[in-house]
C-alpha cells in the first residue's frame, strides 16, 4: 500500500479516493451515501452543500464512519481562518483546505490553531484551481505558468506548516520531487476516461496516471456519483491503487 496513504489512514481504511458529494440537498446526499462503504473512500463536502445543510449533515456523515474533507477553501485574515480550523477540528473533520495565496501568516495561524489536538485535521493549501489556465492567471496579474505558480504556493504552504496541497495530477510529479514523500498531494480532475470531460476541470488524468505521478488522494465527483454502480467504480479505482502501490 502507498505509504503516503497509510500514514493518514487506519489499517481498515487505506484508500486514495475522496468522493466529492456534489449534491444540493441533504436528502439526495444521504440517499447516495447510504450505499457507500467508508473503507472504500473518504468524502468531501463543498461550499454548495455545506451552505445548504450546515454542520449537521457533516457531523452525521462523520458519525457514520466517513473521513470528511471539508472543502470550504478558507481565505481570510489569520485569526478568522484559525478559528474556523479549530471549529472543524472540534467537529472531527479529517481534512480542511485554505487558499495558499492567503499568505504565510494565515497558514501558520491555522497550523498553530489545530496543533494541540490529539487527532488534528490535515491542513491542505489550495494552489491554482484546476479550472484555471495560463490565460486566466494573466487576467489576474500573474504572468506565470500554472505549474510555476503551483510550485511557488506549495513551497510556501509546506514552510508555513500545512500538511499538503491541492494540485492537478500534472503538477504532482514536480511537487513530489520538490517537497518530498511525506507531503500530501490531493488531486481533483480525476476521470475514468480523459476523453469524458464535460465540466470545468481542465487539467485532468485517470486514477492510474495520477497515482503514478505521485498523487496521494484522488478527488472524484461525477464519475462516481453519476455512475450506474458507484461501489463498483470505487472498487476498481482501489484495485488500480493497490496495483500502483505494489
Curated annotation (Swiss-Prot):
SMART domains: OMPdecase (SM00934)
Known role: Catalyzes the decarboxylation of orotidine 5'-monophosphate (OMP) to uridine 5'-monophosphate (UMP).
One CC-aspect GO term: cytosol
Pathway assigned in UniProt: Pyrimidine metabolism; UMP biosynthesis via de novo pathway; UMP from orotate: step 2/2
The UniProt record lists the keyword Lyase: yes
The species this protein was found in: Neisseria meningitidis serogroup A / serotype 4A (strain DSM 15465 / Z2491)
E.C. numbers: 4.1.1.23
GO biological process: 'de novo' pyrimidine nucleobase biosynthetic process; 'de novo' UMP biosynthetic process
Catalytic activity: orotidine 5'-phosphate + H(+) = UMP + CO2
Protein name: Orotidine 5'-phosphate decarboxylase
Amino acid at each position: 500500500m502507498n505509504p503516503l496513504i497509510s500514514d493518514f489512514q487506519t489499517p481498515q481504511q487505506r484508500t486514495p479516493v475522496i468522493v466529492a458529494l456534489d449534491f444540493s440537498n441533504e436528502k439526495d446526499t444521504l440517499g447516495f451515501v447510504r450505499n457507500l462503504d467508508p473503507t472504500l473512500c473518504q468524502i468531501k463536502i463543498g461550499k454548495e452543500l455545506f451552505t445548504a445543510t450546515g454542520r449537521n449533515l457533516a457531523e452525521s456523515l462523520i458519525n457514520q464512519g466517513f473521513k470528511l474533507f471539508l472543502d470550504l477553501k478558507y481565505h481570510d485574515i489569520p485569526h478568522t481562518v484559525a478559528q474556523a480550523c479549530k471549529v472543524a477540528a472540534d467537529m472531527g473533520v479529517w481534512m480542511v483546505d485554505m487558499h495558499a495565496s492567503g499568505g504565510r501568516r494565515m497558514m501558520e495561524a491555522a497550523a498553530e490553531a489545530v496543533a494541540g489536538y490529539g487527532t488534528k485535521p490535515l491542513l491542505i493549501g489550495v494552489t491554482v484551481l484546476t479550472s484555471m489556465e495560463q490565460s486566466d492567471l494573466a487576467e489576474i496579474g500573474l504572468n506565470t505558468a500554472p505549474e510555476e505558480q503551483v510550485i511557488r504556493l506549495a513551497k510556501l504552504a509546506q514552510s508555513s506548516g500545512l500538511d499538503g496541497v491541492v494540485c492537478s495530477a500534472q503538477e504532482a510529479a514536480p511537487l513530489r520531487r520538490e517537497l518530498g514523500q511525506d507531503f500530501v498531494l490531493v488531486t481533483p480532475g480525476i476521470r475514468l476516461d480523459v476523453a469524458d470531460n464535460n465540466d470545468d476541470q481542465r487539467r485532468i488524468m485517470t486514477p492510474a496516471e495520477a497515482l503514478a505521478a505521485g498523487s496521494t488522494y484522488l478527488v472524484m465527483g461525477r464519475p462516481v456519483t453519476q455512475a450506474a454502480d458507484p461501489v463498483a467504480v470505487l472498487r476498481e479505482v482501489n484495485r488500480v491503487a493497490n496495483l500502483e502501490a505494489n
